Amino acid sequence: MAEMSNYLENALINAVLRNTSYTSPATVYLALYTTDPTDADTGTEVSGNAYARQSITFGAPSNGVTTNSAAIEFPQATGSWGTIAYVGIRDASTAGNLLFHTALDASKTIATGDVFRIAVGSLSVTLA
């Protein structure tokens, strides 16, 4: 995942090149989308049916890459979440700002009773 949101791009430029402070979030969260969130944060995030963003723990970066150091598991869906085609990393458990986003390698339809999981090391963020 290397697609940064407009929000994060501007925050990093301001912090690195303009000496404007940026406060990193204490926790970041994975959000699931049925449409592309885009750099402008305009996608359709899943809602309802027991959906909630899940916190992510990342390991130390190496050569500009970091991966999740713990599995990410969403609650069991109590109804359809639709077809998940994109994920985003956000700075709050609700609302907040989109930081990174990407399309999944393969979309996944979540029906009643399904659980969406991402294994350790399967979510990566790359700055290049």
Q: Where does each model-flagged region fall?
A:
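Small cysteine-rich, disulfide-bonded extracellular modules of the LU/uPAR three-finger superfamily
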Residues: 1-87, 91-128
